[in-house]
């Protein structure tokens, strides 16, 4: 029996309202711009996925690139890794970052979903893993909000899924306010549980040295992106000075960036973003690199697919949980005792609420 062949692509986009406003050093958001992908095969299988490129104004350009890249795969049997390598080779004249990588990721996720559905296996099983709850941290709050609100917000985040690991955003104008924010969160969370922190690239190197020195004894699990992600020399200096682990990776554009960061020893941990790392195929390559360097690997956003991939990541650490896409999903993944529960269904289990897509539609 021959394998199904690829027939068509459907790309839609929406600007989904967030339940809580994101307030970080880099910028604030009230909505999350999402692109959905559906790839239909000759047997009726539909591979699905989504990416979130943040800036709605750029979505038409990404969608156009997706459609252009997709043309070469019509009429062929599903072969995600082969397709991925072909696109990566073809983008050598465009550069392996930005819009081209986002478009590739969107297609790659849907190709893998279709491949797993054709095999009648959950994605993680299709990739050689097993279905097991995935340790996660709640990243749905603790932005740069007034410090006196953080105690109550922490209790809310713990209760919503029985989490014992949270992430706080730091980098306020006054260091004393960051210290007070940590104190308020820890008062609710407890010192025995993990608290992570993220500066969202908001500090200059001199300010980062000052802030991180002052916070190095706070018992934080990691310092995330204190300075511009591309300042490798700065990260080397911070890593040498601090005992708290340094993590970055959400801005790695493809496995090559991840390799350079680990090879140059600029961080202790990494946390790839499914979209920017170039999709499932890019994640799997990055996971192999992290395994070779013995570096713990966490995730950034996209908890549905990322949790499945954590099951086949040798150095898997923590999966970031956000609820940003939940209004769009027919059946959001469940959380139990701070773990993401992977559904026992073929593929990723992602299906879209068409009413929500239509309500918040972005014209392409």
Predicted regions and their residues:
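Metal- or metallocofactor-binding catalytic centers and their adjacent structured scaffolds
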Residues: 3, 10, 40-118
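Flexible C-terminal active-site loop/helix
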Residues: 4-18, 28, 298-364
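Conserved, mostly hydrophobic/aromatic
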Residues: 6, 44, 107, 120, ...
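Short catalytic helix/loop segments, enriched in acidic residues and glycine
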Residues: 28-36
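Short beta-strand elements
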Residues: 35-42, 333-335
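Hydrophobic faces of well-ordered beta-strands that scaffold small-molecule active sites
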Residues: 49, 136-140, 164-168, 195-199, ...
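Metal-dependent enolase-superfamily TIM-barrel catalytic cores that perform enediolate-based chemistry
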Residues: 125-241
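Shared catalytic-loop signature of beta/alpha-barrel
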Residues: 213, 219, 230-339
């Amino acid at each position: 029996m021959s394998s199904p062949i690829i027939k068509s692509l459907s790309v839609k986009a929406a600007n989904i309202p967030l339940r809580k406003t994101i307030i970080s050093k880099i910028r604030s958001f009230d909505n999350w711009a999402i692109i959905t992908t559906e790839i239909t095969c000759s047997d009726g299988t539909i591979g699905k996925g989504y990416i979130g490129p943040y800036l709605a104004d750029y979505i038409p350009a990404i969608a156009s690139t997706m459609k252009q890249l997709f043309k070469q795969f019509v009429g062929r049997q599903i072969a995600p890794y082969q397709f991925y390598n072909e696109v990566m080779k073809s983008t050598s004249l465009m550069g392996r970052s930005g819009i081209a990588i986002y478009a590739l990721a969107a297609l790659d996720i849907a190709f893998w979903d279709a491949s797993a559905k054709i095999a009648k296996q959950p994605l993680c099983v299709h990739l050689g893993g097993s279905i097991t709850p995935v340790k996660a941290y709640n990243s749905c709050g603790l932005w740069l909000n007034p410090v006196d609100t953080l105690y109550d917000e922490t209790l809310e985040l713990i209760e919503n899924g029985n989490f014992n690991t949270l992430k706080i955003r730091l980098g306020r104008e006054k260091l004393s306010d960051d210290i007070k924010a940590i104190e308020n969160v820890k008062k609710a969370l407890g010192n025995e549980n993990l608290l992570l922190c993220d500066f969202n690239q908001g500090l200059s190197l001199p300010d980062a040295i000052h802030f991180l020195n002052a916070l190095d004894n706070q018992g934080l699990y990691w310092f995330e992106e204190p300075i511009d992600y591309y300042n490798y020399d700065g990260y080397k200096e911070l890593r040498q000075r601090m005992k708290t682990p340094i993590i970055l990776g959400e801005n790695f554009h493809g496995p090559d960036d991840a390799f350079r960061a680990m090879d140059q020893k600029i961080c202790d941990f990494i946390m790839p973003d499914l979209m920017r790392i170039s999709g499932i195929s890019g994640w799997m390559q990055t996971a192999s690199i992290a395994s070779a360097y013995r570096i713990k690997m966490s995730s950034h956003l996209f908890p549905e697919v990322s949790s499945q991939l954590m099951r086949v990541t040798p150095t898997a650490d923590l999966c970031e949980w956000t609820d940003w896409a939940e209004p769009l999903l027919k059946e959001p993944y469940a959380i139990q005792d701070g773990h993401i529960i992977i559904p026992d269904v073929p593929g990723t289990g992602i299906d879209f609420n068409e009413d929500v897509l239509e309500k918040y539609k972005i014209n392409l």
